[in-house]
Swiss-Prot record:
PROSITE patterns: UVRD_HELICASE_ATP_BIND, UVRD_HELICASE_CTER. Gene3D superfamilies: 3.90.320.10, P-loop containing nucleotide triphosphate hydrolases, PCRA, domain 4. It comes from the Bacteria. This is ATP-dependent helicase/nuclease subunit A. Residues 519-809 form the UvrD-like helicase C-terminal domain.
Amino acid sequence: MKRIPFLTAEEIALKQAQEAASDKPQKKTAEQIEAIYSSGRNILVSASAGSGKTFVMVQRIIDQILRGVAVSQLFISTFTVKAAGELKERLEKELGQALKEAESPELKQHLAQQLADLPNADIGTMDSFTQKVLSRYGYLLGLAPNFRILQSASEQLILQNEVFSQVFDHYYDSERQALFSRLVKNFTGKRKDLSAFREQVYRIYSFLQSTSSPQRWLEETFLYGYEHSDFAAERERIFCQIKSALWELETFFSAHLEHEGREFAGAKYQENVQDALTVLAGLNESSSIEETAQILKQIVALSQLSNGQAFTARVGKNADELKKEMAKDYNEARKPMIERLRSFDQQLYQLDFIEQHQDECLPLVELLRDFVADFAQAYLERKKAENAFEFGDISHFAIEILETFPEVRRFYQERYHEVMVDEYQDTNHTQERMLDLLSRGKNRFMVGDIKQSIYRFRQADPQIFSDKFKAYQEDSSQGKLIVLKENFRSHLEVLEATNDVFKRLMDEEVGEIDYNETHYLVAGNPAKREPNPANRASFLIYEGSKESPEEEADEGLPQAVSAGEVDLVIKEIIRLHNEEGVAFKDITLLTASRTRNDLILAAFEQHQIPLVPDDGAANYLQSVEVLVMLDTLRTINNPLNDYALTALLKSPMFDFGEDELARLSLQASQERSQENLYEKLVNALEGRGLNPALVTEELQKKLQHFYETLQSWRTYSKTHSLYDLIWKIYQDRFYYDMVGTLVNGAQRQANLYALSLRANEYEKSSFKGLSRFIGMIDRILENQHDLASVPVAAPKDAVRLMTIHKSKGLEFKYVFLLNMDKAFNRQDSSSAIILSRTKGVGIKYVADVSVSVKDSYAPNQLRISMDTLPYQQNLAELQLASLSEQMRLLYVAMTRAETKLYLVGKGSQEALDKRQWGKSQQGRLSASLRSQISNFQDWLYAIQDVFSDENLAYETRFVTDEELTAEEIGRINEPVLFPADDLADNRQSDDIRRALDILESVDRLNSQYRSAIELPSVRTPSQIKKFYEPIMDTDGLDIMDERAAFRPQPSFELPDFGKKAKVTGAQVGSAVHELMQRIPLDSSPSMAVLRSALAQVQADDAVKKQIQLSKIASFFETDLGRLLIENSDRVRREAPFAMLKRDEASGQEFVLRGILDGYLLFEDRIILFDYKTDKYKDSSELIARYRGQLDLYAQALSRSYGISQIEKYLILLGGEQLQVVKVD
């Protein structure tokens, strides 16, 4: 199809004016139109929540296709596989509609081709695309195309641990052993456990995987902080802050003495304040660092007089309330200022100490870099040996291919008309490098919202988006910036609440983006612009004594939601459901973590509210039914394992009680007192135990049955797969059926079924055997890892419980954000190593410091841990980035709501009101306050307090225990579907009669519609070929008639009784088809090109040797072969198709699926060709055999493109000479 020019700026403006003047109920915004039709340069679309970014992407793609761009000429990267599938579905629907409306044959043909090509279009995650690149071009790096993905974190950890041990041993035995010991002890201290050091190595490795070039980052950036430490600049920076703090204190003291201080005239503290002002008077702009330091020390010394109360205003008990309040306000405002100055004094002392010792740690940091580099290389080599890679490896291989081989890079750059990416704010540097390499510099289209960048833990870097946003905003020649801020999802009340919070919370200093008019959410849906007071956002704070049973849990675990918060939420859900008729499916609970939500599940079950929790929690191996099966397998592997054997005996499979096990434990033999439980079991069976009288006849039978069952399983395990063994256990003891009768039976059965599948997948890898499988599971558990739980079908009308991360991109009518008082996770800030993309590594260094002491018993050397200067700088960067991401998490959570938003926390009104939230600065909370706050709740409460004179769009209400009694909470008003006495009224005879009637009717239907029942819903051309063949289908064999039976036949091979399997015709056929697909068609292929293509074929060497390349070469000398070369842009190879057919016997329709070897697509005709490797003597036999199959292919092509002229060719490669036969 001939290309249609893209719209000019003037034409886009006209389109915008026409849309604005139209009477459509829902119009496109001017910004949406601009994003759909703009072209000719890089475009960044900043799309706020609910602004219709997916709609814009779909419409832009459709517009480009309607202008003649093929879907195969678009690269579209999505954040998830699910998003890619949804995008394809939308495009399929839009293309189908466009095809119906198309009038010109040329456009119809073009659109039909795009529909056919859509399943194979490059629409997917960057990981899926890099896999394609590596499969196709991995041979350039010496990599096999049949690699597998190491997706399991547990499997990765096992390999990492093995490689780490090898590299560690190498370094420990090297000439740098002394320095290496110092490095290890720096992180492990006196502990012999290496886990602390190993953990830091793995953290650095994980960070490396997100860089575009790990080796280059290690070489150029890793040591940057230590090689460029500027203590003078750091002092200058600190002293600038000190001067500001001192002047702030001077202003505060002066104002105090001038105004409210008069009420305290003559008080002792005022003399100290006056002395401080005298000292502060010596500070000016020209004061040197030394002078400023001296003034700081004097102020700190003054503040420490009177036991640190020198500046404290005191009033007597009998003073009036106003005076008490004035003293309180003064003291609370003064306290943080003095504390800040004291911290500066300490900071200067520490800086001097660090400067003396930091150079000592440089050799350690260099050695750490070398160790990580060697570990990364050794780990990569191990993965190459396994032919299994992580996604990061595959991305780096793809980048290496595109950077190293210009011809490959040009291929992709010339192929793609546009490089599009969704969720651009969550891009990491590896992905950004890939996008750069695929684009031509001015053909990128990027969509995202920096306010929704919440995947820093996956190494996403919102700075990539932010830098482009600023660059395009300041200089349009670099690219076009389009901002979509109209929200079509939410009601006005949700948007106003979100704006009211974030315009007072988020700016570039704390938040990494200035939330101003550019980013304010605007209601775009006319139906949702009308105010509705009932939808006003609610900030509900539970103030009571109901706690979570896990309140005193480990510090490392997420903070659990309190019982009172859950009751509060349940009460409101019951009200919504009973009074407003809100369906459960319209309600969603959001939490920061998917763990420790058991209290929520139990409470909802108690109140009979259906709840579907977020899937994917890694607790599969902790489920009871899986634990029982693992102990069963451990016992089969090694019966001498007392723990596993005891667990198996006590399990429901054998049901031994405590008394029976106690009797068994007393059956040690006469000769040995210390025996395993299994040996005691054998003794009991043979009557050789010390206390045979304790073994009753019933217990004897039970033990005998157990012993025989166990032995049968052990015997079976030696000759069968793990999968078969597991299912034998399920069937022998009816364990699978039994767990299905328990609570959550479907989930339990799914877990058991998944165990068999995981065992099967395990044996497909390079690992084999029960012992190694058990060993792998045990290593996973030892490292405190687990496997993801198995999802099961959920009820349709149920409240959903999910994490904020999981909710991104989704929308729900009613949203409850729980646990607002949960403290932010700041574990990264306490790590011994902190990494920065630009500043490299920063470590905590343990220095050996000599001290002079008089006491002979005191140590003369101390080990002191210090935060090196690069560590401090990286920490400040990390804390700001973490805090900014927490703001974005809150933004994502709040913008999920369509109708009403509930923000739920826990706290004391008295305590919250006592907090000093400070004053506003330029319409926001002060930067220092925002930085110090550690949970969502305090942010919102501070906004309410500081801006109390403004009409905020959310209401705050405290809820007490009195409001959460059982009577106040209420219950769901649902009719009882199955009364308790129903079962008592049933009669068994009626049930049996009804069941027999049903079975009889089923039998009649089966007989009546047998042909339709036996008809498969999907067939392939090979399966229905017999309907078209005039003779018996013996695909791949010679067909002999009566006369041919007496002709002399070619000799045949004798049976091969060796170890090597004989090459089959099917194997050769598959290899030939793959070879024909890989041959480049840019010119007539030489033998060298054919050999290179053959090397890429995924087949055994024995199979490849059966392929005669001379025949392939001669094909390209035929008329058809030359036609393919001359029209390579029109050639389609290995094209899948699907077509609806009707079965003559049943009259039912079925889907015919297949893959075409290839065809040439012209405007008025199609040339279809098919390769056949069948042995033959007479080509007419093959033509007769495959005519029906080719007719089906031709029919499918004709339907797809609306072209009736189809030429059909068979390319016969199984004879002595190549033949290209036209089939009429």
